[in-house]
Regions:
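N-terminal Rossmann NAD(P)H-binding glycine-rich loop of SDR-like oxidoreductase domains
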Residues: 111-131
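NAD(P)H-binding glycine-rich loop region in Rossmannoid oxidoreductase-like domains
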Residues: 161-200
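Conserved Rossmann-fold NAD(P)-dependent oxidoreductase catalytic core, especially the SDR/UDP-sugar
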Residues: 175, 181, 199, 206-248
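Flexible, glycine-rich beta-alpha linker
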Residues: 228-229, 244-247, 272-291
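C-terminal substrate-binding subdomain of Rossmann-fold SDR/epimerase-dehydratase oxidoreductases
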Residues: 310-313, 317-427
Length: 427
């Protein structure tokens, strides 16, 4: 290299040869003393403090520090910040910081962690993903002890999302690449315990976001029809519109959507989110949500032949069978990044009222007795939610298409609950 080459080029050449020739302490919190002929000068926590500009060592060191922060060794320019700076969280990183991270190619075998795994969706999602990635590559976690069949079905560990250190240890020790964050208190339960809902749904989310950003994970956080409020368009509700929910559950989900989008733009976090409608699943008990009447009716119809609904018979809400929900979740996670025009999508399959659902069930179990005892809290929540979702962006961007409509849903649910004898008698 010519002796007249600029310092930046000379530094790059020397670093490429493995002999930078000096010690950098630019990122150290300690203070460094630089001794020159003009006397001692102090250098604080970051390069750029006032130091005698005529000192050649300082000028070269500052250029190297800038080059190291902006240009990773692999030669590509880093534009995102997926990791913490010396143990600090993304919330504490300087605004002008840039880092380079290792990303996982689509061909790599994913290592998956599911938080809140013993809720309505976690067990089914684990089973679904294990068929795709292998039994040992999908780890279910929760703070509760799992039933024996869940424990024996694949890896299960204790995980408290409010314990950041525990969460970080799990991600590191198990080489996690995808994280599905299902820990949350649902709508009606959250209203009964706002402080706990705030801790789980918001503080827990912050921990998950930080861990995912630090380790370059692909993160999925479900949202909900509850993220909308009474001032939102209800029929249909588009992806982008005013969102003013009136439950702590809804507020926390809007917060999750916006924080995930912020981390995507600010730190490069691969955040993906679906707004679920009411999800109907056969193999789980109702979890305290406003739409859980649509699950409870099948349990009660088969067990007792009677069902008391806590919503008005004409309350229309968007719904989806769990198989469609799980498939949509995997499809959006596997979608190429360039195909996604937004970070949060509506998805939908059907929309019905309690009366319409009961009428369809009566086709199979004519002796079913349905009564209505309206819960004013749940009814107020339902009246503030969408009646129909506009999911045209999901269908256009990554090819979403549902399989189950109301007749298929009812038949599948009743068959699962062992109602074949009742169906045969009715026929």
């Amino acid at each position: 290299m010519a002796t007249g080459a600029r310092p930046r080029e000379r530094i790059k050449a020397r670093c490429a040869q493995g002999r930078p020739g000096f010690l950098l302490c630019a990122l150290s919190p300690c203070r460094v003393r630089l001794q020159g002929r003009s006397g001692a000068a102090s250098l604080g926590g970051c390069l750029g403090r006032r130091v005698t500009e005529s000192m050649p060592v300082f000028r070269v060191s500052r250029q190297v520090a800038c080059w190291m922060l902006q240009s990773p060794a692999c030669g590509c320019r880093a534009s995102v910040l997926p990791s913490r700076l010396l143990g600090t969280s993304p919330r504490q990183i300087p605004m002008d910081a840039n880092f380079h991270s290792t990303s996982f190619s689509e061909a790599d075998q994913q290592r998956v962690l599911i938080t809140g795994g013993l809720g309505q969706l976690g067990v089914g999602l684990a089973s679904f993903l294990r068929k795709r990635f292998g039994k040992d590559n999908v780890i279910l976690s929760d703070i509760r002890k799992p039933p024996e069949h869940v424990f024996l079905s694949g890896p299960f560990i204790y995980s408290d999302i409010l314990d950041y250190k525990n969460l970080r240890e799990i991600v590191v020790n198990n080489r996690i690449t995808w994280l599905f964050h299902y820990s949350a208190l649902l709508s009606a339960v959250g209203e009964a315990n706002v402080s706990l809902a705030r801790a789980v749904n918001i503080t827990g989310l912050h921990n998950v976001l930080d861990v995912a950003a630090e380790h370059g994970l692909r993160l999925f956080v479900p949202s909900t029809i509850g993220a909308f409020g009474p001032t939102s368009p209800r029929n249909p509700t588009p992806d982008l519109c005013i969102q003013r929910p009136r439950t702590i559950y809804g507020v926390s989900k809007v917060h999750a959507e916006l924080m995930g989008e912020y981390y995507y733009y600010r730190y490069g976090l691969d955040f993906r989110c679906l707004r679920y409608p009411g999800i109907i699943s056969a193999d789980s008990q109702p979890g305290g949500g406003t739409t859980d009447y649509a699950v409870q009716i099948f349990h009660e119809a088969v067990k007792n032949g009677r069902f008391e609904c806590n919503l008005k018979p004409d309350t229309r809400l968007p719904m989806m069978y769990i198989d469609d929900c799980l498939r949509a979740t995997l499809e959006v996670m596997e979608a190429p990044a360039e195909s996604l025009s937004m970070r949060t999508y509506n998805i939908s399959a059907m929309s019905f009222t309690p009366a319409e659902l009961a009428q369809e069930v009566l086709k199979h179990i004519p002796e079913l007795q349905v009564t209505y005892n309206v819960d004013p809290v749940r009814q107020a929540i339902a009246d503030s939610w969408p009646m129909n979702f506009d999911d045209s962006n999901a269908r256009k961007d990554w090819g979403w298409k549902h399989d189950f409509d109301l007749p298929e849903l009812v038949t599948t649910m009743l068959n699962f609950h062992g109602s074949e004898s009742r169906v045969a008698q009715a026929n």
